[in-house]
Curated annotation (Swiss-Prot):
Known partners and oligomeric status: Heterotrimer of UreA (gamma), UreB (beta) and UreC (alpha) subunits. Three heterotrimers associate to form the active enzyme.
Enzyme Commission designation: 3.5.1.5
Protein name (record): Urease subunit beta
Organism: Staphylococcus xylosus
Known catalytic reactions: urea + 2 H2O + H(+) = hydrogencarbonate + 2 NH4(+)
Enzyme class: hydrolase
GO MF term set: urease activity
Amino acid sequence: MKPGEIIVKRTEIEVNRGHNATILDVKNTGDRPIQVGSHYHFFEANPALQFEREKAYGKRLDIPAGAAVRFEPGDEKEVQLVEYSGKRRIFGFHGEVNGPIDEARVYKAEDDDSATEIIAEENKVSENANKESGYNR
């Protein structure tokens, strides 16, 4: 044994054990690679990613913290998502939630022409912490 050495058991580490999982097929319809990190609210991921968006509400990728999944243009992958835990409040990302995760706030667009499902306008939170930064679009 060397000074400072850590010896760990040779067993698999179970990530997100006990969380409800959702499996989705995702396709990158864009012309650029898209990478989604481990704790990104998948519902708010890049609009060029085509998937059943309403099923991703309140969920993140079921991968180790700090990891990411990369979608090259035209890639189709199956991903597993798990629900956020804790206080179940989301702020930031694309600013579509900015508050508690409440499935009643989401609906699927009725017409087939719509590319994505959205949070009903009356349920959106207008205060976005990102708007107060020095960043102007």
